[in-house]
């Protein structure tokens, strides 16, 4: 019987693409190194070269007031914050706040200089023998916790504005509940310093508007509506909403590591 020899397999022929006719290799220019200049690499080890400039703010010994405010901010994130305190972190939105402060600007208390000039004019008129008619007292914003509390209790306040960063917070902690009880619209805004500027002081905890001019009643009505929907009508939601309880990056990493270890153990037991 004749045994057939296996035929050798043909090798696949790969076609080479012809090079582009105008492709010319660029000559490599060698960098001329001056032998006079010796390379001296820096060593940034301990006790060696001067260290390069880095951001060392993490290692700065900050003043005590900065350390305290940072620790306070961290604690407020970590600890569980009860609703009466947590509500002070939810402030009035920017657009409504701008409208509100524009309105309050018109009812700033009289400056000492303006008062002096007004009284001087009245005195001069009286000295000349003219009859000075008593003008209607202009409506100003009322400031201070005690004054505002009295106005709320008497139901004279039309709007109460509370600062969110009062320290200690106990000074104004009861005001939102009192406003809700007496049916007075209230809002929490950013900055005791901003309120203080309105009443010509450094800081101010609370303001209250008792009367508004007829020209501003339309704008005041819109602001009141926004304030009521954001604060007074959201009472039940605010009452249930706790704050804080946010873990730091290290704690989260530790928890995730433990969970991974537990998952690995379970997999080994089942496998």
From Swiss-Prot:
GO terms for cellular component: cytosolic large ribosomal subunit; cytosolic ribosome. Keywords: Ribonucleoprotein, Ribosomal protein. It holds the Pfam family Ribosomal_L7Ae. It comes from the Eukaryota. SUPFAM superfamilies: L30e-like. GO terms for molecular function: RNA binding; structural constituent of ribosome. InterPro entries: eL8/uL1-like (IPR050257), Ribosomal_eL30-like_sf (IPR029064), Ribosomal_eL8-like_CS (IPR004037), Ribosomal_eL8/eL30/eS12/Gad45 (IPR004038), Ribosomal_eL8/Nhp2 (IPR018492), Ribosomal_eL8_euk (IPR001921). One of its GO terms (biological process) is maturation of LSU-rRNA. Belongs to the eukaryotic ribosomal protein eL8 family. PANTHER family: RIBOSOMAL PROTEIN L7AE FAMILY MEMBER. This is Large ribosomal subunit protein eL8. The gene is RpL7A.
């Amino acid at each position: 019987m004749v045994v057939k020899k296996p035929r050798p397999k043909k090798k696949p022929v790969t076609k080479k693409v012809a090079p582009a006719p105008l492709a010319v290799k660029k000559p490599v220019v060698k960098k001329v190194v001056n032998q006079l200049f010796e390379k001296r690499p820096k060593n940034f080890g301990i006790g060696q070269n001067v260290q390069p400039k880095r951001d060392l703010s993490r290692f700065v010994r900050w003043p005590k007031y900065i350390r305290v405010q940072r620790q306070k901010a961290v604690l407020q994130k970590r600890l569980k914050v009860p609703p009466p305190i947590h509500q002070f972190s939810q402030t009035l939105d920017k657009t409504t706040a701008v409208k509100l402060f524009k309105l309050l600007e018109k009812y700033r208390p009289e400056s000492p200089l303006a008062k002096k000039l007004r009284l001087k004019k009245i005195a001069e008129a009286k000295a000349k023998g003219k009859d000075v008619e008593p003008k209607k007292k202009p409506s100003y914003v009322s400031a201070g916790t005690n004054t505002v509390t009295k106005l709320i209790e008497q139901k004279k306040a039309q709007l109460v504005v509370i600062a969110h960063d009062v320290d200690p917070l106990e000074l104004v902690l009861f005001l939102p509940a009192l406003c809700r009880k007496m049916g007075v619209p209230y809002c929490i805004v950013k900055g005791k310093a901003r309120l203080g500027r309105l009443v010509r002081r450094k800081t101010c905890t609370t303001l209250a508007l008792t009367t508004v001019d007829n020209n501003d009643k339309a704008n005041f009505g819109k602001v009141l509506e926004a304030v009521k929907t954001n604060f007074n009508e959201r009472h039940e939601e605010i009452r249930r909403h706790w704050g804080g309880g946010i873990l730091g990056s290290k704690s989260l990493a530790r928890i995730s590591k433990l969970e991974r270890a537990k998952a690995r153990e379970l997999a080994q037991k089942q496998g």
